[in-house]
Design a protein with these regions (language model features):
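Glycine- and aromatic-enriched mobile tails/lids
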Residues: 1-185
Length: 185
């Protein structure tokens, strides 16, 4: 039944490939989607409609959903990072509680001008900014998927940051005078 297969695919993706991700669950998801792809070949067209034949169109779109799910799950599995839609807790770095994102701009300026010294920032801030910068060099890229006949191949393309420099985000602060959200009504 194509509708049952669609429901299973949806449940698998919603359970394992959202914002917080885990490599073991992602690997299992990739395997499960391959199973759905095999099962799709045996889907029956359970069309009882006497007008417009919606089931054949749905079966065709289900195939496309499975292929796109392969791209999403494999791309997620390959990206070991800690931010945005690729958040994996095992790769998270601890942002110092008193860190202000704008200090990263100062860090990059000092580094570019050759004026960065070990005592330019607090040690934990400097360590955080260095790790953040290394992570950008590795993962500030778009994932590009191509189909090889058996599944997706994932490659990467650098993101142009010449107009806006990326900087760390701080989710535990509001704009209003940096009052913590827990204390802000």
């Amino acid at each position: 039944n194509p509708y049952k297969l669609h429901a299973e695919l949806s449940e698998t993706m919603m359970s394992n490939v959202l914002i917080v991700r885990d490599n073991a669950r992602l690997a299992a998801t990739v395997e499960k989607i391959d199973e759905y792809d095999e099962r799709w070949k045996d889907v029956e067209c359970v069309d009882t409609s006497d007008w417009t034949n919606p089931v054949p169109s749905f079966v065709n779109q289900l195939y496309n959903m499975i292929q796109l799910s392969k791209v999403i799950a494999k791309g997620a599995l390959l990206r070991d990072e800690f931010r945005g839609a690729h958040y994996k807790p095992e790769f998270e770095i601890n942002q110092p509680s008193d860190f202000k994102p704008e200090s990263f701009l100062e860090y990059t300026k000092l580094k570019a001008d050759g004026g960065l010294k070990q005592d330019s920032f607090k040690p934990d801030h400097l360590e955080y900014m260095q790790f953040y910068e290394e992570s950008n060099e590795k993962w500030l890229k778009s994932s590009i998927a191509t189909f090889n006949g058996k599944g997706p191949d994932i490659n990467y393309e650098a993101v142009d940051t010449s107009l806006i420099q990326p900087r760390p985000r701080k989710y535990d602060w509001t704009r209003e005078r940096n009052v913590k959200k827990d204390n802000y009504l």
